[in-house]
């Protein structure tokens, strides 16, 4: 998989993306089901004679270790990609020309599809769809007496855009990429004219997607499945992933808003959701970093 250095580099990256996707499914179904047992006081024991609470604790310990390992392998792969001229960087580290290009890209493609959401007494915390990435931002205005008046807003990272943005090359062999959420947080002041940015935090919520269908009670199985699918889209939160420099006040605010506890938080060293690398693995001209496509032949 991602560890075996004999495996082509982009196949190792693809494996990391697959593992990330599988872990999402595991939380949406298996962890959600165990949480459901705990909440409803259902006592069931598995083959190791562990109840749901004990299983959840063991899962948490394993997943925390797994996520750390995954990030180590990912960083190794991204570092190796630099040997082939592929660099993942931050918007603030770009040269003047590249920053100008990115500013134009932001104004043309990103700004029009991002809708900031206010969170205050008149605007409750919005329902954030499963696996979307969002930034919570604390903004302020200076009052006449010199104090800061704070507000909270959510910047949804649009899923209609590719998470990985390539910066046009400067005629050399280097390919440079930035992440969509970094561009949005880097330009966050564009969304809040007249406000200062105090701090922000990028996060991702995983929701319960376990289908609960009571076949005994359901007179019409089709409508029961449809109702279950509707509930699934608005399932309870089961995991919160955060990355970067985590601000405790913002983390507590999100936890309270989505009804999770500190034990449900996974702090990610790097960018959230490795599934974004699936597309990158098909980058043209890098066939030497992929397996040779299998061509079926007639016997």
Would you name each region that the model predicts?
Residues 1-299:
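N-terminal localization/anchoring segments of enzymes in phospholipid and broader phosphate metabolism
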């Amino acid at each position: 998989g991602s560890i075996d250095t004999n495996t082509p580099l982009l196949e190792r990256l693809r494996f990391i993306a697959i593992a990330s996707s599988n872990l999402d499914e595991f939380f949406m179904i298996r962890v959600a089901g165990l949480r459901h047992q705990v909440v409803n006081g259902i006592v069931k024991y598995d083959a190791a004679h562990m109840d749901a609470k004990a299983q959840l604790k063991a899962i948490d310990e394993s997943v925390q270790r797994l996520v750390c390992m995954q990030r180590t392998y990912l960083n190794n792969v991204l570092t190796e990609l630099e040997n082939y001229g592929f660099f993942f960087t931050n918007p603030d580290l770009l040269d003047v020309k590249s920053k100008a290009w990115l500013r134009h890209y932001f104004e043309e493609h990103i700004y029009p599809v991002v809708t900031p959401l206010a969170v205050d007494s008149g605007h409750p915390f919005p329902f954030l769809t499963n696996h979307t990435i969002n930034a919570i931002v604390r903004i302020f205005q200076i009052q006449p007496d010199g104090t800061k008046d704070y507000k909270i807003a959510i910047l949804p990272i649009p899923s209609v855009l590719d998470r990985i943005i390539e910066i046009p090359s400067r005629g050399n062999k280097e390919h440079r990429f930035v992440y969509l959420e970094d561009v949005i947080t880097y330009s966050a002041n564009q969304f809040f004219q007249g406000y200062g940015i105090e701090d922000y935090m990028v996060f991702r919520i995983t929701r319960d997607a376990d289908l609960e269908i009571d076949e005994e009670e359901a007179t019409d199985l089709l409508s029961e499945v449809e109702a279950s699918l509707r509930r699934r889209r608005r399932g309870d939160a089961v995991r919160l992933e955060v990355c970067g420099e985590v601000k405790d006040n913002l983390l507590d605010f999100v936890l309270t808003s989505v009804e999770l506890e500190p034990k449900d938080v996974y702090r990610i060293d790097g960018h959230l959701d490795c599934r974004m690398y699936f597309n990158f693995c098909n980058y043209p001209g890098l066939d030497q970093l992929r397996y040779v496509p299998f061509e079926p032949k007639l016997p």
